Regions:
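Extracellular receptor-binding modules and their adjoining Ser/Thr/Gly/Asp/Asn-rich linkers
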Residues: 1-77, 81-83, 91-98, 116-128, ...
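Short loop/turn motifs that cap or connect beta-strands within the blades
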Residues: 53-62, 106-114, 157-165, 209-217, ...
Length: 483
């Protein structure tokens, strides 16, 4: 016989097991084994509203100046904050996400006095976190490097960023250049938008030459890294022109240069946060729109070369708010906007945003804490596939600084057990060719190619953490058995 497929029986080549289906399963699709012994089609299931974990209390009192980063070297979440239960000292703590819960190690005081305008990001090249802030002692700008070890963290000494009065710090890691960029408002007379490129070595950081992107008194600065263009984007209020703007920065060595400004709003913004949607390949900004009753607003930006343009803004909530954050969830391919809802008792609230082209659509609002919520910041944890929110909240006159998780989507591809031999109705029993068998009712394969299970249930030669097996023909695959 000329074709191997002629040797295989219709449907499958052995190792078939009957399972009860949880949900409808199509013919020849990948399935995962559930904890109750049923099987479901491999898919990414969107959660709207998000599934929230329980709050984990970091300390009892209010916290301020929240900054959050994800340490991809240690698979940990780092939270930095002003601890009002301990003389307002600047403190950091390491969180471990397990399922929907997050637990914390011991806190570490990295500066025994107050600071303001705290910002933090993880430098993946060095495997360290970098914080930057305005020191209350001299009003100068400083940075420090933090090292995570297990569930603990320690910091190196202060390094001067700006030897003049500086504020509005925003730290972002540029993955293309392998450098950390610090944006801030600096001299002269606190009206210049300035940036420096930092190189982390051990527990310290050194900075290149100063670069200025505007002299128009920028405020409410936020930034993000666009991994598609390999650029960083800084968003700010142009307080001289009374408008909201953004500009693209290109890092080369220890220097940064800037393109032309793009306008995202004809009025000022108050408080902004910025993230990058790697699925849509767009920048997403959440900001308080001073041009529209201080409503919380979001907008999508597109980087092209050294320029950035914006789509049409969308109101998140029609009430005044200056307390919000936006983070991209790579599991759901959505952004999560978290905010204090002044129209609903100042409760902590979220909306899920879906970016399409230069537009964004929003889900209904979902409350995650029924109490006054302040100093919100979040970060996506790819290990747990959840966003971690850290914030200060007050319920019944008691203040607590807490963190909790939000799950926007769940994936079951790591539970891959085999391929269905025929369509199976929900709650019905049907045959599945399990790992170690040969499934011969798949389509679109290339013989002798290795295939992997993708998070959406498809088979692809693109590597993933789940090996499916090797194709024997265009319709048959020898399913790998390793567990």
């Amino acid at each position: 016989m000329s074709n191997l497929s002629d040797l295989l029986p219709a449907g499958a080549g052995g190792k078939q097991v009957d399972f009860v289906a949880s949900g409808t399963i199509g013919n020849g699709v990948t399935v995962g084994l559930n904890s109750n012994g049923t099987v479901s089609a491999i898919a990414t299931v969107q959660n709207s509203p998000p599934v929230y974990g329980a709050e984990s209390v970091i300390f009892v009192n209010s916290g301020e100046q929240t900054a959050v980063a994800y340490d991809s070297l240690n698979n940990k979440v780092v939270v930095a904050y002003r601890d009002n239960s301990n003389s307002s000292y600047m403190t950091a703590i390491v969180g471990t996400v397990s399922g929907s819960s997050i637990s914390f190690g011991s806190s570490y005081v990295f500066l025994s006095r107050q600071v303001s305008f705290l910002s933090m990001d993880f430098d993946a090249t060095a495997g360290k976190v970098v914080v930057a802030y305005k020191d209350s002692q001299d009003n100068y700008g400083y940075a420090q490097v933090g090292t995570v070890s297990g569930t603990s963290i320690s910091f190196g000494s202060q390094v001067l960023v700006s030897g003049n009065s500086s504020d509005d710090f925003s730290v972002v890691y540029d993955g293309t250049a392998g450098k950390t960029v610090v944006f801030y408002r600096g001299t002269p007379y606190n009206v210049a938008g300035e940036a420096k490129v930092g190189t982390v070595s051990g527990t310290s950081i050194s900075f290149g030459s100063l670069a200025t992107w505007t002299n128009n008194n920028p405020g409410y600065i936020s930034s993000a890294y666009d991994s598609t263009s390999g650029k960083v984007v800084v968003v700010y209020a142009d307080q001289s022109a009374s408008s909201a703007k953004a500009i693209v920065g290109t890092v080369s060595g220890t220097s940064i240069s800037f393109g032309s400004e793009g306008t995202l709003d004809s009025g000022l913004l108050y408080a902004s946060d910025t993230t990058y949607d790697s699925n849509a390949q767009r920048i997403v900004v959440a900001y308080t729109d001073a041009n529209n009753s201080n409503y919380l607003t979001t907008i999508v930006g597109t980087v092209s070369g050294t320029s950035i343009s914006f789509g049409t803004s969308v109101v998140v909530v029609s009430s005044y708010t200056q307390n919000s954050c936006v983070d991209f969830d790579a599991t759901a391919n959505k952004v999560l906007i978290a905010y204090r809802d002044n129209s609903n008792n100042n409760y902590g609230t979220t909306k899920i945003g879906t970016v399409s082209g230069t537009s964004i659509s929003l889900s209904s609002a979902s409350v995650f804490v029924s109490g006054l919520t302040n100093w919100l910041r979040g970060v996506y944890d790819p290990d747990s596939q959840r966003i971690v929110l850290a914030y200060s909240r007050e319920i019944s006159s008691q203040y607590k600084f807490v963190a909790q998780t939000a799950q926007l989507a769940s994936q079951n591809f790591t539970s891959f057990v085999g391929i269905s031999d025929a369509a199976i109705s929900s709650a019905a029993s049907g045959s599945v060719t399990i790992k170690g068998g040969i499934s011969s009712n798949v389509t679109g394969l290339t013989a002798n190619s290795t295939y992997y299970v993708q998070s959406d249930g498809t088979l692809s030669t693109t590597s993933s953490s789940v090996l499916a097996g090797k194709a024997l023909s265009s319709t048959s695959i020898n399913l790998d058995y390793t567990t």
